[in-house]
């Protein structure tokens, strides 16, 4: 595993002419943040040794390097999901490669179903914590020496980044929620009973990604900021039939607000933080 990570990182280093310390994983319907990246160059997943290839509509499958504002970044346009049949090690492989490339801060985004009755479709939820509901753990097996065998998860999402995001949202007049994200394996959307269960467990939103990448990022010593777009509601009396197309449509509608927060936050990262 470590050899594959290093082989992939060496391949990318040979193609890179920037040295980003910031990475972004762009989720469902949020890939258009890539349009904000300037001076960019791209590498398709299919051309990268050992990389899985995304199979989900709306995830185009490439690494993008360049600048967002004045900050050098790398972005994953298209992520890998457990429900696609990948192992957790494959799902999180890119995060370990990021660590090998010198990434210090990771920004993750996703679409989710809201279980908090105060949420509305289109809300942005800053992720303050998560619940891992996946059946396989990404750190299962021999420990890769990027971090300890038993990593601490008491601050999986960096509090200073959350504080700065709140300040940016207030400054720009963007409404944001705070909440706990629960990650499930999918690919089915939740039943009303499952939504109710997840709310009882303490989750404010549910989705099929993010948690594995965040666990591995924490193991690698990478700071994380996560934001979720509430694209449907799992609240009693508000549950309607949902499709992937509707999820993408709701995510696309919220995208300008998310882009503003991400762009501003990435450009306000302190050197000491990154």
Q: For each predicted feature, which ranges?
A:
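Zn-dependent metallopeptidase/amidohydrolase metal-coordination segment
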Residues: 208-246
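Metal-dependent peptidase/peptidase-like ectodomains
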Residues: 143-181
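Metabolite-binding pocket within alpha/beta catalytic cores that recognizes anionic/polar moieties
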Residues: 1-153
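His/Asp/Glu-rich mid-to-C-terminal helical/loop segments that flank catalytic regions of hydrolases
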Residues: 235-274
